[in-house]
């Protein structure tokens, strides 16, 4: 996977599944963000459930929203 410039990648745990493929994720630094699934994960039907460990990409412009890019097995 290619690294993107200016993107913050951080691990977290999904705490709640919301409508429209949105999730509330608690990050390792105890912040809570709203995250959606990346397009490739959607394309490959990767399911995300509460209590899953995930990697979230955050934009430096809005640290309250993110994109889930990986789910640990």
UniProtKB/Swiss-Prot annotation:
Protein name: Translation initiation factor IF-1
S1-like domain span: 1-73
Described purpose of this protein according to its UniProt entry: One of the essential components for the initiation of protein synthesis. Stabilizes the binding of IF-2 and IF-3 on the 30S subunit to which N-formylmethionyl-tRNA(fMet) subsequently binds. Helps modulate mRNA selection, yielding the 30S pre-initiation complex (PIC). Upon addition of the 50S ribosomal subunit IF-1, IF-2 and IF-3 are released leaving the mature 70S translation initiation complex.
Family: Belongs to the IF-1 family.
UniProt-recorded Gene Ontology molecular function terms: ribosome binding; rRNA binding; translation initiation factor activity
Keywords, alphabetical: Cytoplasm, Initiation factor, Protein biosynthesis, RNA-binding, rRNA-binding
Pfam families named in the record: eIF-1a
Keyword hit for ATP-binding: no
NCBIfam families: infA
Quaternary structure annotation from Swiss-Prot or TrEMBL: Component of the 30S ribosomal translation pre-initiation complex which assembles on the 30S ribosome in the order IF-2 and IF-3, IF-1 and N-formylmethionyl-tRNA(fMet); mRNA recruitment can occur at any time during PIC assembly.
Lineage: superkingdom: Bacteria
Cellular compartments annotated: Cytoplasm
Gene Ontology CC annotation, any one: cytosol
């Amino acid at each position: 996977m290619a690294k993107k410039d200016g993107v913050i990648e951080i691990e977290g745990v999904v705490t709640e599944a919301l409508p429209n493929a949105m999730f509330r994720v608690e990050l390792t630094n105890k912040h809570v963000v709203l995250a959606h699934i990346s397009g490739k994960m959607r394309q490959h039907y990767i399911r995300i459930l509460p209590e899953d460990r995930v990697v979230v990409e955050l934009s430096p412009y809005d640290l309250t929203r993110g994109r889930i890019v990986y789910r640990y097995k």
